[in-house]
């Protein structure tokens, strides 16, 4: 029973362990080039992660719900930012584009360093994930303080938009 959300702590631990195992396997296969998840796979994993985190927040009333927002801020804001950008630019949402922060960082690494594509992809992922890991480590110190967690969210949005503007000016490639 993979998605049995009860109030029993063992059920939540079982789910978390199963989720970590599946996520680790998918990550390993993806890094080895044996599987490509694409946007649909990323959205599916995000859905399951979101369900678990919302349930976790609901069952732990002493932890600020803004902690969950901090944990999910990057993919949620990336999607929201892309939707607003595409609406403003009048581009179709179902067509791929290369105007995402991760693609600008990729172009930066490609232009500034002489790495092969696998190293560039790995470096781009490492930069974004390391930043988010640092944010998570800081946020965990304030799990009971909604005010601090809101400040962290606002600062992250500011950093994201600033980085986006900087990298877009310098490293946007033609679509």
Regions found by a protein language model. Give the residues of each.
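Alpha-helical transmembrane segments
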Residues: 1-175
């Amino acid at each position: 029973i993979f998605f049995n959300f009860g109030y029993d702590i063992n059920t939540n631990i079982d789910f978390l362990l199963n989720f970590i195992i599946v996520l680790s396997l998918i990550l390993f296969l993806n890094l080895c080039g044996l599987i490509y998840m694409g946007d649909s796979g990323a959205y599916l994993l995000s859905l399951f992660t979101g369900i678990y985190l919302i349930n976790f927040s609901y069952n732990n009333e002493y932890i600020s719900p803004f902690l969950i927002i901090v944990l999910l801020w990057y993919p949620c804001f990336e999607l929201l930012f892309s939707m607003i950008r595409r609406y403003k630019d009048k581009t179709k949402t179902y067509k791929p584009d290369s105007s995402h922060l991760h693609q600008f960082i990729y172009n930066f690494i490609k232009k500034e360093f002489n790495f092969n594509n696998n190293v560039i992809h790995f470096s781009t992922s490492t930069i974004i994930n390391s930043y988010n890991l640092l944010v998570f480590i800081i946020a965990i110190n304030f799990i009971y303080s909604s005010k601090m967690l809101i400040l962290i969210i606002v600062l992250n949005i500011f950093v994201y938009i600033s980085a986006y503007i900087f990298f877009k000016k310098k490293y946007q490639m033609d679509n």
